[in-house]
């Protein structure tokens, strides 16, 4: 297994859907989309359907009964007007999400999911389900794994690279090899911060952005909680993620 990391969707090579592309793609958005997705599916959501475009989200959501859907939307770290939930993993509790489909669009994470949507195997990872995703990949043994960060509006993010390094650390222990320099750098970042990932999330520029927006202590704790979940969000059809146990 060869593992590569690309900081944002815009850095993903155009060969993604060709013979030199990945057998599996893993999307990362630690603050906060892939953390929220993992917790929503863990807490019983029927599925999370992701959209880069808000008009497409609303059109698809309107085809579902009100009692079976939730609109989850965020731009700039804030909940969108008219949506049921923002992008906080603390909001997707069982009483709210169980049995429902979440129609989700965020500033960054849903763009990366859209970029890799045609890959045969698409997963999402965050720190809470790091080991579950690692075990899924170790069991399946795809030849090429591309991790794709979400960044912030097309630019590098510290926290996504941290999670990429965390996942790669588990994969390398099982015999995987590093395929690009971005992956090597992410591993070095994880080595530096693995004993206190929450501190890394807080000093990251997006962490600082959330701090300026208000009290997000609970979000930071949840996003930094390592290996707490066994759920592996897996694309069942383009844009639709469902829970699979790791």
From Swiss-Prot:
It comes from the Bacteria. SUPFAM superfamilies: ComB-like. One of its GO terms (molecular function) is magnesium ion binding. Signal peptide: none annotated. It catalyses: (2R)-O-phospho-3-sulfolactate + H2O = (2R)-3-sulfolactate + phosphate. Gene3D superfamilies: ComB-like (3.90.1560.10). The keyword Hydrolase applies. Keywords: Hydrolase, Magnesium. Disulfide bonds: none annotated. This is Probable 2-phosphosulfolactate phosphatase. It comes from Synechococcus sp. (strain CC9311). The lineage of its organism: Bacteria, Bacillati, Cyanobacteriota, Cyanophyceae, Synechococcales. The gene is comB.
């Amino acid at each position: 297994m060869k593992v590569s990391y690309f900081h944002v969707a815009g850095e993903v090579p155009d060969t993604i859907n060709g013979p030199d592309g990945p057998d599996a793609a893993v999307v990362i958005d630690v603050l906060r989309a892939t953390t929220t997705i993992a917790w929503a599916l863990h807490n019983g959501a029927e599925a999370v359907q992701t959209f880069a475009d808000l008009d497409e989200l609303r059109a698809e959501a309107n085809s579902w009964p009100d009692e079976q859907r939730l609109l989850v939307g965020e731009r700039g770290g804030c909940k969108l007007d008219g949506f049921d939930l923002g992008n906080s993993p603390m909001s997707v509790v069982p009483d709210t999400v169980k049995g429902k489909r979440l129609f989700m669009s965020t500033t960054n994470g849903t763009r990366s999911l859209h970029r890799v949507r045609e890959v045969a195997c698409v997963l999402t990872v965050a720190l809470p389900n790091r080991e579950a995703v690692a075990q899924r990949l170790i069991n399946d043994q795809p030849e090429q794994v591309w991790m794709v960060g979400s960044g912030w509006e097309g630019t590098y993010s510290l926290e996504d690279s941290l999670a990429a390094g965390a996942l790669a650390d588990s994969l390398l222990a099982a015999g995987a090899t590093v395929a690009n320099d971005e992956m090597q750098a992410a591993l070095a970042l994880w080595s530096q911060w693995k004993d206190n990932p929450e501190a890394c999330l807080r000093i990251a520029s997006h962490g600082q952005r959330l701090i300026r927006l208000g009290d997000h202590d609970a979000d930071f704790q949840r996003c930094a909680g390592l290996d707490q979940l066994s759920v592996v969000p897996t694309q069942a059809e383009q844009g639709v993620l469902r829970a699979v146990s790791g």
